[in-house]
Every structure is written in C-alpha cells, then in structure tokens.
C-alpha cells in the first residue's frame, strides 16, 4: 500500500513527510513562521532548520527537547511542554530573544500570559510548582551523567535504528514516515489491516507492551521512544513483533 494514500477510517489524510523548504510559502504580510519540530502523531521530524524567508521563526519543541543537541540561536523563540523528556506535566519551557519581549501586548491579554511578566520576575511571578522543578533538576543531572546531549542523541539513534531496521525488512509491518523525515521519538507503523493492527495492540498489551496504539487521529500503531525508554524496551518490542509476524497474527 502506498504510504501517501493511507487514510484513517474517518478519511483523514496521513502525512508521511515534512515539506521541503523549496515548497514552503509564506504570506507577505505574516509576522512570523510557526513550526512544530517533531510530530508525535505522524512520527515525522524536521532534521534541519527550515528557511523562514527572513520571518521570525517560532519552534514548538515539546516532544523532542533534550533528545539531542540543538542550536537555540537558529530560532527566534522555542517553547514547549516538558512532559515528554524533561519532567512531569505542569511546566513549560520558553526560550525567546530578548528584543521580542515587549511591553506592548494585545488588549485584554492576562498578566500571566505575557512573556515580560515572567522574564521580569525570573519565572517566579507566582509560586512555582517546586516539586516539578525538583524532578526536572534530577532529570537534567541524569542526562549529564550519561554524557550530555551528544550521548543522549546516540542512545536515541540506537533505539530508533533497532525498530526502523526491523520495519524496513518486515513483510507484515510498514513504517509510516519517509526515511528523510523519520522521528527518533515517535515511530509510527501499520500492518495494512485495521483488524490486524488492533490484534497486535491487544497482544502487545498482554505481553507487557502498553500504550502502543496509534494516535486517535490516524490510528495504526505507535512506539514512543522518549529519553526514559531503555534500549531493552525497544529490543523487547522488536522481539515481540518478530514473533507476532511469524505467527501470522495468531500470536498466543
């Protein structure tokens, strides 16, 4: 089945590739370009900074922050939730050029939603969620103990390669994302049959592999390989996929 033709039962088109810079367009009167570097739904990722044609470039890094090194100066603003790789839900990260922090805001903008409010108060305008911040500190020290972001990237590449290599040779499972757009964090795939996808998800759950079902918007199967996932977890998944394929979907 051609990946570009995959559709959810509700007729939602699935995008296996991020658009290349050559086909990007921007409105001449636009103030900025917004991008989401890593798509958890489709399992795709921008692997290099797109050309924003001189516009301010804002990057949502919620699902890939601290998974690999990045040059923050390539962007005018980076932001995202931290709940994928950095700590528990309830905190956000925002890295913004100082000259973009303005006194001028849209009328009616609440004080708490103004970047200047938090910049002026050192991110402590109100009582911060101290326990969440404590956990973030622990996670950062853990990443440093492994060897920092360069080492973290190598670990994540090794984990993803295990699964992608199997998908590339499998006769039953097929990866969704094109090779040049593949995510290290979220790997999406299918069997080509919704019934077989469901059977796989059910059997996986019975064998200690949970939350493997694809996003509700597109269905299928998805493996989330965030920093905290050990390589042994990916090895277990691949071994189970091999057994499931050999059983032709009749795994017991």
Model-derived features: positions:
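Short amphipathic alpha-helices in soluble, non-transmembrane regions
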Residues: 198-207, 236-242
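General beta-strand structural signal in soluble alpha/beta enzymes
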Residues: 4-9, 35, 57-61, 78-81, ...
